[in-house]
C-alpha cells in the first residue's frame, strides 16, 4: 500500500495511492488506515512532503562509500546533526540552494517516522506496537 500526503482543493489530506487516483484516509494515519469514499485523480492533487517534522536528526558520514567519495573514512560512530524542518520538500519541488553554499551532496535517505514522543527505544522494542509508549 502506498500512502501520500496531498493538497487537493486547498486542503491537506493523507491518501492511499493507486494507479489512477488518491483515496482519502480518515483521521490519523498513525492510528489506523481507514479509507473514505472521497477520491481525486492523480492529476488533480499536489504531492506534499510525507510529514511535517518537529525536528530532523541526521547522521554524518555514516556509510563507507560516501566517505570514500570525499577522501574520508566513515566515522566509527556516526555524528548526529540537525536539519531544519523547512528542508523537507514535496514531489517535483525545486531544491533551492542558498547563495555561496559551496558543495552540495545528492544523497538517497532512509527515514524513520515516529508518530508519538519517544525516548531510548531499544532494538527489540522497534518491532512492537508499544515502542512509542516507552
Positions of predicted regions on the chain:
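Structural signature of FAD isoalloxazine-binding scaffolds in flavoprotein oxidoreductases
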Residues: 74-91, 106
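Short beta-strand segments
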Residues: 7, 58-62, 82, 105-107, ...
Amino acid at each position: 500500500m502506498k500512502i501520500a500526503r496531498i493538497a487537493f482543493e486547498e486542503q491537506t489530506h493523507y491518501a492511499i495511492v493507486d494507479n489512477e487516483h488518491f483515496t482519502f484516509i480518515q483521521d490519523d494515519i498513525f492510528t489506523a488506515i481507514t479509507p473514505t469514499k472521497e477520491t481525486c485523480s492523480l492529476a488533480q492533487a499536489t504531492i506534499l512532503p510525507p510529514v511535517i517534522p518537529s525536528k530532523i536528526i541526521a547522521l554524518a558520514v555514516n556509510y563507507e562509500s560516501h566517505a570514500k567519495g570525499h577522501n574520508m573514512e566513515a566515522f566509527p560512530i556516526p555524528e548526529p546533526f540537525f536539519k531544519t524542518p523547512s528542508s523537507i520538500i514535496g514531489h517535483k519541488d525545486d531544491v533551492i540552494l542558498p547563495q555561496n553554499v559551496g558543495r552540495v551532496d545528492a544523497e538517497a535517505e532512509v527515514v524513520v517516522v515516529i508518530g508519538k514522543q519517544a525516548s531510548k527505544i531499544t532494538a527489540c522494542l522497534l518491532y512492537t506496537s508499544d515502542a512509542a509508549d516507552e
